[in-house]
């Protein structure tokens, strides 16, 4: 069986501000297999890396990322919330991220959709992401979303691109059965670690699908994911996950 791949969640987010170049570069100081990040759109429809609903970490707790054009986001400091001594860092665009990291490790790009956005804006985000990535090259770069409609649209727009359906904590085994039966194009599911069990693993393996899990930080969570043989283990502490994997397999 192939070993589980360790992905840094928004970079090394315990060592630098998440989704910044510093976080990605620090993550790559470890022998990680991949990086997970999040894509949203600026007001002028530039794909940028940002997870949260609001810009509280940039000192703007009532504002969204799409309240600002890309140029304004570049001038903001997205590192100050992590440490007052951190060097200022503006927003990272998806284009910059791909140019810097696509040849260095696997990438899992989560396309974030928000309730206040129109369906057309969701689709713009999908198109921009897939256009910037280009033709799929196996599972070197994958896209994911909690929004199944966005993944269905992505499959129509770029057939064959590896698309992963992210599950919420309240979704069930029956939801997984339904998704796999109705959406056979899915590359796999990304499950909350609390939802991972042998029954769900067997379901996904029987369908020939990939299994990713988030967010595995404790020893128990990491061990559970590794023992069940997930394909992708997403962690805020990738160095710990690497150490535990090495102890289990004899190699990092």
Where do the protein language model's features map onto the residues?
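Phosphate-group recognition and catalysis centered on beta-loop-alpha active-site segments
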Residues: 1-252
């Amino acid at each position: 069986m192939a070993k589980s791949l360790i992905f840094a969640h928004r970079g090394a987010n315990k060592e630098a501000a998440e989704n910044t170049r510093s976080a990605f570069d620090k993550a790559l100081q470890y022998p990680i297999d991949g990086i997970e990040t999040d894509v949203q759109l600026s007001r002028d429809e530039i794909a940028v890396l940002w997870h949260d609903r609001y810009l509280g970490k940039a000192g703007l707790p009532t504002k969204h990322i799409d309240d600002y054009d890309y140029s304004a986001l570049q001038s903001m400091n997205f590192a100050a919330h992590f440490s007052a001594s951190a060097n200022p860092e503006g927003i990272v665009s998806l284009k910059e991220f791909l140019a810097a990291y696509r040849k260095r490790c696997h990438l899992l790009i989560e396309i974030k959709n928000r309730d206040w956005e129109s369906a057309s804006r969701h689709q713009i985000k999908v198109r921009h992401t897939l256009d910037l990535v280009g033709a799929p090259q196996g599972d070197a770069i994958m896209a994911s979303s909690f929004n199944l409609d966005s993944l269905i649209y992505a499959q129509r727009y770029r057939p064959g691109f590896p698309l992963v359906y992210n599950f919420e904590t309240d979704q069930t085994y029956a939801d997984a059965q339904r998704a796999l039966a109705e959406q056979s194009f899915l590359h796999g599911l990304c499950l909350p670690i609390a939802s991972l069990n042998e029954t769900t693993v067997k379901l996904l393996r029987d369908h020939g699908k990939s299994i990713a899990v988030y967010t595995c930080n404790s020893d128990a969570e990491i061990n559970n994911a590794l023992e069940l043989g997930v394909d992708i283990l997403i962690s805020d502490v990738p160095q710990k996950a690497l150490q535990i994997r090495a102890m289990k397999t004899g190699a990092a």
